[in-house]
């Protein structure tokens, strides 16, 4: 599994790309089985990037048994991942002026097997020249970081409240 189990949540960040250079916005993904053609396409493109990395050893090929185990682990935290993703989108929407593309699900390898709430944030589209310029700006990246930070604090507080009520 690409994730260590001792963490309380997993937030991965990435930059998106699209053949349609007019597409803009940010979105947050959580792990699921690919159910739509779009989800399959997005996951295929994202997962293909692993082949370009120097340390491919971090990404083991998943046997059927490992896929089942990873799916079970991810499923246990699906609702919490949905809550975390929604809070992230809400907080980023307060900070950014680009479109909020919402919370989505796809079978990203980097999210599989997480025994914790786990999401992937796509902070913008490098394929769009305007967003590429924004993403190169330290002040814009700080807005993204601030939004994510506030979302983590808000999510943590919501989890502590739930645990206190149990």
Regions found by a protein language model. Name each.
Residues 4, 23-24, 37, 114-116:
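Short, solvent-exposed loop/turn segments at the edges of secondary structure
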Residues 11, 29, 119-121:
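Hydrophobic/aromatic beta-strand patches that form the interior of the parallel beta-sheet core
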């Amino acid at each position: 599994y690409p994730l260590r189990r001792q963490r309380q949540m997993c937030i991965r960040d990435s930059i998106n790309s699209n053949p349609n250079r007019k597409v803009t916005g940010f979105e947050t993904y959580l792990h699921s089985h690919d159910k739509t053609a779009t989800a399959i396409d997005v996951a295929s493109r994202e997962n293909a990037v692993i082949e370009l990395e120097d340390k491919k050893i971090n990404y083991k090929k998943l046997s059927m048994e490992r896929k089942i185990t990873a799916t079970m682990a991810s499923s246990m935290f699906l609702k919490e991942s949905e809550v975390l993703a929604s809070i992230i989108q809400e907080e980023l929407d307060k900070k950014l002026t680009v479109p909020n593309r919402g919370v989505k699900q796809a079978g990203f390898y980097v999210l599989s097997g997480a025994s914790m709430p786990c999401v992937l944030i796509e902070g913008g589209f490098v394929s769009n020249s305007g967003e590429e310029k924004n993403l190169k700006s330290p002040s814009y990246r700080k807005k993204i970081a601030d939004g994510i930070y506030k979302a983590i604090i808000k999510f943590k507080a919501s989890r502590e409240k739930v645990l206190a009520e149990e």
